[in-house]
Each structure stands twice: as structure tokens, then as C-alpha cells.
Regions:
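Short beta-strand segments in beta-sandwich/barrel cores
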Residues: 261-262, 278-283, 297
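Short acidic-glycine-tyrosine-enriched beta hairpin
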Residues: 157-169, 284-304
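C-terminal amphipathic alpha-helical segment
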Residues: 195-263, 267
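Short, basic/aromatic beta-hairpin or loop at an interaction surface
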Residues: 138-150, 268-279
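Transition-metal
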Residues: 1-139, 199-227, 251
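His/acidic/aromatic-lined binding-pocket segments of jelly-roll/cupin-type domains
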Residues: 87-88, 96, 118-121, 159-160, ...
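Ligand-binding loop in jelly-roll beta-barrel domains
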Residues: 80-82, 90-95, 104, 125-128, ...
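Loop-centered beta-sheet repeat module
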Residues: 147-195
Length: 320
């Protein structure tokens, strides 16, 4: 079964910029594109297959039809017809709200299906781009509520100057916000549970403040303080470099300028490749060939045993 490409869902937002369309080499007229949903099984926002014999089918339809052949037997037992990951590109022309996501346990207690753990990988961003990630000082839930009320919550959160290649892991409970000028790839659990903590007192087009979820968020926040929330890793050429390993996804980055064959014969999972830079050709063990270039995301079925990658190409690899 050949690797699958999808028609991305472009989302215009009040904070969206102009980086996504040229990055994805698209010939479309759409302004303020803040997000490109690359591979999604979120109900109502399912991406549609763009190539091969399954062209025109929604991702969740394909999971239902192919089951473990597509996602892996263990994943199908765990998630059923729901695809477990959501892949996005995000371009922030303005600051996004400060947010937190619940753990699976807390989400179920609050009547939600599951929580959300995610990660960010920075693409070429503005020179002065920053983001917020994790508490930098010990606060109590009571102090948190007071800081939200008096507009000082940002003082308690670590702010990072960011550049291309930076990586941040966001386990459920870690407070965070994407800042102005950030352009990034996001890998997350399939979940729409987001609690907005603070929105910089902004008003929508109707003059209303956006809803905050201060109380729900207080239960979700991990109040532990860490010295560094940025993932430290050493870039390497022509090999996979692990960025994140967690129960929800495992992610590595590859930066290739010579051919490489990746062995998936022992892996019981789909694999997603997210193009970051350059262009390459991938050929699977059945002889199916497709291109992978910056701005493209490819779903490799679980039945695939090997992938040969050729070309000058940099990409993320993620699987469950």
C-alpha cells in the first residue's frame, strides 16, 4: 500500500500570517492563514486523501476500512476508528492566548473524551519571535487565579527567544503560548480540549472578550517548575535524532544529503513524515515512489517495511 498524501485544511484566523501558503507551494488566494491541518481525523475537520487508489476518502473512513493495516494492530485496538494524531503547521502574526490542556485522567473527570499532549518544532520564524512554555516560579492555584485577574500571569511563565530547529515538548498540564512571529510544526493527540487562561484583554470583531477557562485550567496546570523547557539535542546529518518519546507519539528529525533506508519492519504503527526543508524521493519496499518536500506531510501505512529516502531533504518522523 502506497504512502498517502492529503489535501490540507487551511484555517484563516485573526492572528494568522502569510508564511504557510508559500511554504506549502500552494497556488491559492487566502489571507491570514494561521493553521494548516495536514493530517487530521478530527470530526468535521477530516483531511481527504489526495493521491492513489484511495483519493477522495476521508482519513477516518480509511482507518475504518483498513484498520490495523493502516495504523498498526495495537493502535487500532487502542484507538479504534479514530486516528490518534493531529499534524499542523502554525503561523502566528500575533500572540496566541495562554493555554493549558488536561491529562487524559482529568479530561475524563471533566466530561471530555481525552486530554492533549503535543510538541512544537520551529520552522524559519521572525528574528524576534518568542514563545511561552512552562512555569518559571512556584505558584499555588490561588496565586495563579490572582495573577490571571490582575494581568501578571505572563510574569510566572518562561519566555524563550526561538529559532529554526528549536523543539518544545508540551505534556498535558504544561502552560504555554505561541508568540508573535513563530512559525512551527505541531504534533498532538487528536483532541479539541483547550483551556484558555489569558488572552491579553483582546476583543473580537464584535467587541467582546473571548471566553476564559480559568477555573478548569487551574485543575489541569502542572505547578512544578523546571529549569529548562526547551528540548536539548545535537543535530546530526544522515541519521535520525530523537526529539520526543512519550506514550502518545515518538518523534525524530532527519537531515539527509545522501540516500538512507529506514527500517520499519519491527514497528507496529503508521509513520508520518513532515517535510521541513528541501526535497526528496521516498520509495517503499513494494516499489511505490513519491516525493517529500518542505510543507508536505505523508502518511506511511503500518504494513510498510522499509523506506528509502533520496535527496537533500529535512523532515520530522513521528509514530505512535
Amino acid at each position: 500500500m502506497e504512502p498517502l498524501k492529503f489535501n490540507a485544511l487551511l484555517k484563516s484566523t485573526i492572528w494568522g500570517g502569510e508564511k504557510i501558503i508559500p511554504f506549502k507551494h500552494l497556488d491559492v488566494q487566502q489571507e491570514n492563514v494561521g493553521e494548516s491541518w495536514e493530517i487530521s481525523g478530527v470530526p468535521g475537520n477530516e483531511t481527504v486523501v489526495a493521491n492513489g487508489e484511495y483519493a477522495g476518502k476521508k482519513l477516518n473512513e480509511l482507518v475504518h476500512e483498513l484498520k490495523g493495516k493502516l495504523v498498526g494492530e495495537a493502535n487500532y485496538k487502542r484507538f479504534g476508528d479514530e486516528f490518534p494524531l493531529l499534524i499542523k503547521f502554525i503561523d502566528a502574526r500575533q500572540d496566541l492566548s495562554i493555554q493549558v490542556h488536561p491529562t487524559d485522567e482529568i479530561a475524563k473527570r471533566q466530561g471530555k473524551e481525552r486530554g492533549k499532549t503535543e510538541m512544537w518544532y520551529l520552522l524559519p520564524s521572525d528574528a524576534d519571535a518568542t514563545l511561552l512554555c512552562g512555569l518559571k516560579q512556584q505558584i499555588t492555584p490561588t496565586q495563579y487565579a490572582e495573577m490571571v485577574e490582575n494581568d501578571t500571569i505572563c510574569d510566572a511563565i518562561s519566555r524563550y527567544d526561538v529559532k529554526e530547529g528549536d523543539c518544545f515538548f508540551l505534556p498535558a498540564g504544561r502552560i504555554h503560548a505561541i508568540g508573535t512571529g513563530c512559525f512551527l510544526a505541531e504534533i498532538q493527540q487528536t483532541s479539541d480540549v483547550t483551556y484558555r487562561i489569558y488572552d491579553f484583554k483582546r476583543k473580537d470583531k464584535n467587541g467582546n472578550y473571548r471566553e476564559l477557562h480559568t477555573k478548569q485550567a487551574a485543575e489541569c496546570i502542572n505547578y512544578n517548575v523546571e529549569s529548562n523547557y526547551r528540548t536539548e539535542y545535537t543535530p546530526q546529518k544522515n541519521q535520525g535524532v530523537s526529539l520526543v518519546q512519550c506514550p502518545y507519539f515518538n518523534t525524530a528529525v532527519y537531515d539527509l544529503d545522501e540516500p538512507m533506508t529506514i527500517d520499519y519492519s519491527e514497528l507496529d504503527s503508521f509513520v508520518i513524515l513532515i517535510g521541513l526543508k528541501g526535497e526528496g524521493t521516498i520509495t517503499d519496499n513494494e516499489g511505490n515512489t513519491t516525493t517529500l518536500r518542505a510543507g508536505e506531510s505523508i502518511l506511511v501505512p503500518a504494513t510498510t517495511e522499509t523506506l528509502k529516502v533520496e535527496g537533500n531533504v529535512k523532515f520530522l518522523e513521528t509514530y505512535v
